[in-house]
């Protein structure tokens, strides 16, 4: 047949086609890149803003049977519960407007590739005023508490002691000495570093190491530092401070240390200028500044300090007028709830009054009533502290308590002036002052819903801040569930303790217990010193604070 000449052996055809007669379809598992799309989808996502208190049901659909995970980024305000069959209940409740971000992920299988979906739900806050008031009815199991009337040694508040360092030859503080300060009621120590030996030169490496050694001791001993630098204590000294350029060089030298010890520095007093670093008797910064040009050297120093100190920390100026004049501020420019703690220059400049109650104007601390009004408003959001300096009719107990409240005092020196302190003790207000400097959180009650493993539980905490001020540095708030199996589950409370001002406060949050039985704690920890119980806040209630863990027991489910 003519067609035979076109026939080719089968093996040759296979070879020409690049195949082998023994080839068979591959049964190997394809790579993730080759896997099919599982068509992961989420139903029930609202297209519009939802009101706080809304309960949503989310249903996840997918062709794959890979493991599913659903999570929210704000568990304090969005409780998530698995209902089974790929259904989830989401309950949202927030005092302010928020976006709740939800992520859904599914593992890859032999047939389908991994999948993920992310979406956001806008939640309208109920408003701070809509949080339960002190006498409002609250649902759930109620737990009440008894106030601990003793003064409590809490971090970053209270009475302070002082320690001076005059040269690099001095032995730094020992940890034992620091711990002994705590036992006498001091969680704050004013470290006064005198730079007399360096008034015309750079700081020595040895002196800088001495500074660091003192701060190391404070950290290990559980105390924080109020830091001040100065050049002399002598009002008759020929040179009361260094040249402006020298001071700025010293600040630059100190910057690495200030950055390194952010965790243990409570606040930095502006210092450097004048006798004791109090910005008054000065040789090089203008004794009585009036014009913007007069204030220029002090502003140069303040700007340098703002740059040298971590943004989380504040700098105290000796009078409100310094802040107003250097930064062209009027009474209307005081810090508000919106601008507080936003990292701006204005939000980071605080004050210290080292002649508290000495006379009508506290020995020049206040130029006029505007200056007083400025500090009254500003200190709601910035650190205020200092010491007394002379007995007068302005430091009688009733006026003293009013001023401490009005100016939101956080700390006070209990070593000076002894006449004033003795008067407060004999007149019966010293103990009250010791108790209420800074914050003092007293639980009123807690209400919680039924506790079931794996199910979000709503908890309402009502408390009073009986202190003169709110906490001022960043602080975390955690709900800590310790299950009956001993395991710990932590969830952020969702509130900033710096907003817990004097008076009544309340919070509403969620936690998801891992077991049906266990204990719920509130931990108010220092974010830069995690796990340090001595730097955690103790609530002023009996039988609540655990000194070993730094936790405050809210309730136990047995």
Predicted regions and their residues:
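Short, solvent-exposed loop/linker segments at beta-strand-coil boundaries, enriched for Pro/Gly
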Residues: 64-68, 72-80
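Extracellular/luminal regions of secreted and cell-surface proteins that mediate adhesion/ECM remodeling
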Residues: 435-558
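Active-site groove signature of glycoside hydrolases
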Residues: 226-236, 254-291
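Aromatic-lined substrate-binding rim segments of carbohydrate-active enzymes
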Residues: 174-232, 244-246
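Catalytic-core regions of glycoside hydrolase
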Residues: 267-269, 278, 282-417
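An active-site-proximal structural segment forming one wall of the substrate-binding cleft
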Residues: 207-220, 241-267, 294-308
């Amino acid at each position: 047949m003519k067609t035979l000449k076109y026939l080719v052996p089968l093996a040759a055809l296979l070879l020409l086609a690049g195949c082998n007669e023994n080839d068979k379809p591959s049964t190997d598992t394809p790579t993730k890149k080759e896997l099919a799309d599982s068509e992961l989808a989420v139903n029930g996502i609202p297209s519009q803003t939802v009101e706080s208190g809304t309960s949503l049901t989310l249903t996840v659909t997918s062709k794959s049977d890979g493991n599913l995970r659903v999570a929210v980024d704000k568990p304090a305000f969005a409780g998530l519960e698995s209902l089974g069959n790929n259904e989830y209940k989401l309950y949202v409740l927030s005092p302010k407007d928020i976006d709740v971000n939800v992520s859904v992920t599914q593992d890859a299988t032999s047939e389908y590739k991994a999948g993920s979906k992310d979406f956001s739900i806008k939640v309208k806050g109920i408003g701070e005023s809509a949080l339960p008031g002190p006498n409002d009815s609250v649902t759930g199991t109620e737990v009440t508490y008894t106030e601990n009337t003793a003064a409590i040694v809490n971090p970053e508040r209270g009475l302070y002691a002082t320690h001076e360092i005059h040269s690099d030859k001095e032995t730094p503080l020992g940890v034992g000495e620091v711990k002994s300060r705590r036992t006498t009621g001091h969680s704050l120590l004013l470290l006064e570093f005198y730079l007399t030996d360096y008034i015309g030169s750079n700081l020595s490496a040895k002196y800088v190491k001495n500074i660091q050694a003192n701060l190391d001791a404070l950290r290990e001993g559980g105390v924080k530092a109020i830091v001040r630098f100065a050049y002399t204590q002598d009002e008759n000294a020929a040179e009361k401070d260094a040249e402006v350029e020298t001071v700025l060089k010293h600040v630059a030298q100190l910057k690495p240390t200030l950055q390194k010890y952010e965790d243990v520095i409570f606040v930095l007093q502006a210092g450097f200028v004048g006798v004791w670093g109090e910005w008054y008797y000065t040789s090089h910064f203008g004794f009585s500044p009036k014009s913007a040009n007069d204030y220029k050297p002090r502003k140069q120093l303040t700007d340098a300090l703002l740059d040298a100190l971590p943004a989380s920390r504040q700098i105290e100026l000796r009078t409100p007028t310094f802040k107003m004049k250097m930064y062209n501020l009027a009474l209307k420019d005081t810090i508000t709830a919106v601008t507080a703690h936003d990292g701006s220059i204005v939000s980071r400049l605080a004050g210290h009054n080292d002649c508290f109650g000495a006379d009508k104007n506290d020995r020049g601390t206040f130029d006029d009533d505007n200056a007083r009004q400025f500090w009254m408003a500003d200190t709601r959001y910035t650190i205020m502290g200092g010491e007394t300096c002379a007995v007068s009719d302005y430091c009688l107990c009733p006026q003293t308590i009013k001023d401490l409240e009005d100016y939101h005092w956080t700390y006070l020196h209990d070593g000076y002036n002894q006449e004033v302190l003795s008067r407060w003790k004999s007149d019966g207000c010293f103990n009250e002052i010791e108790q209420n400097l800074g914050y003092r959180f007293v639980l009123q009650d807690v209400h919680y819903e039924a506790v079931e493993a794996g199910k979000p539980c709503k908890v309402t905490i009502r408390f009073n801040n009986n202190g003169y001020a709110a906490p001022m540095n960043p602080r975390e708030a955690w709900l800590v569930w310790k299950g009956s199996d001993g395991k710990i589950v932590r969830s952020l409370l969702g509130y900033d303790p710096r907003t817990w001002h004097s008076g009544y406060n309340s919070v509403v949050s969620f936690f998801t217990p891992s077991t049906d039985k266990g204990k719920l704690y509130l931990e108010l920890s220092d974010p830069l010193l995690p796990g340090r119980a001595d730097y955690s806040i103790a609530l002023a209630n009996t039988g609540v604070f655990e000194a070993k863990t730094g936790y405050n027991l809210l309730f136990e489910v047995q």
